Amino acid sequence: MKQIPYATQWIEEDDILAVADALRSSNLTQGPLVDEFEKSMAQYCGAKYAVAVSNGTAALHIACLAAGVSAGAEVITSAITFAASANCVLYCGGKPVFADIEPGTALIDPLDIRKKLTKKTKAIIPVHFAGQPADMEEISKIAKENNLIIIEDAAHAIRAKYRLKNSQDWIKVGSCFHSDMTILSFHAVKQLTTGEGGMVLTNDHNLYEKLVFFRSHGITRSVKYMKETEGPWYYEMHELGFNYRLTDIQCALGISQLKKLDKFIARRKEIAGMYDDAFSKIEQIDFIKEKEGFDSSRHLYVILVENRRNIFNWLIAETNIGVNVHYIPVYFHPYYKRLGYERGLCPMAEEYYSRAISIPMFPKLANDEVEYVIRKIKKVVAE
């Protein structure tokens, strides 16, 4: 059996042709494909506006800036996430506050969000972990009660959805139905890729305008915003923005990939079903569950085992199966320790981390490869 990575992109000939066409065009960046990609993604997710950026971290950063996060502000996010979900708060001078997770899902726990609220809380960044949405109805209720901004971190969860508790209506992640903004990531291991890339979705035109400013140096050429004008060449800088632009080359790939996203997600669900069926019969293995009324887009497949370190090391040393851990609790990192964060903040997150292994999950994974992964994991757990 060849090497099986824990995740990889699925690039086909039509993707390559789309990128080649972009390379032959007169616009490699700041051209029409950026606008097309933004409009296509906004329509797909059910949002009014989309702002494409260079990566998911940039999306989080400008979302925090647009939300008004600044020195002294606290922002609550999950302890189990990639560091960027908290780093974006630090970039703005704010303080990340870590909420614990729900056992069984690794999703941010609304009950612990309530416990972490203070007079300084400005926003909540709920993380849709492994493809499954957090409890946005409850989190939205908390935000409304306390006049807080919500920025959904949906880096894992494009195309995911959840059902409203008192109706049969399904809400798409990215529609911003329960939030002010939603961020997406298009990294190579995500459900849809532009190599590197990200996006902020919103239904608020004022936020949209701020996001556009922050993406591109805070500069505008629109007479709508100018204090003065000296002609069509003239531009003004109104905010301390950044160069977070996504190129037309990358957007060409994103447009092509978006046409196949439903196919990609369907295959991920098939693989998850094979894993669920196999591991539900093994007492020594637990795994992240999909909650009733939630439709995961299956970015990751996480098993939970005792003796995680030994099993992980055996899989690395004795098989050709790529495995990973998602994630180290953010406040465990040395940088956060230097800021004064200590272990013990989020007991459920720490328990989860001690047991979690991410196993291969990507749409090109063949059935015989899935079966091989299952056999090897059964073997090491039994031993």
Where are these regions (language model features)?
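Glycine-/small-residue-rich active-site loops that bind phosphorylated ligands and cofactors
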Residues: 11, 29, 81, 104-105, ...
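Short beta-strand-to-turn element immediately C-terminal to the catalytic PLP-Schiff-base lysine
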Residues: 184-185, 198-203, 255
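Phosphate-binding glycine-rich loop
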Residues: 27-74, 88-92, 98-100, 165
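Structural detector of well-ordered beta-strand residues that form the stable sheet scaffold
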Residues: 51, 76, 97, 150-151, ...
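PLP-dependent aminotransferase-like
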Residues: 65-165
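PLP-dependent aminotransferase class I/II
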Residues: 35-40, 47-50, 111, 123-127, ...
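Conserved active-site segment immediately N-terminal to the catalytic lysine
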Residues: 152-193, 209, 233-237
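N-terminal "arm"/small-domain region of PLP-dependent enzymes with the aminotransferase-like
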Residues: 1-27, 32, 236-238, 360
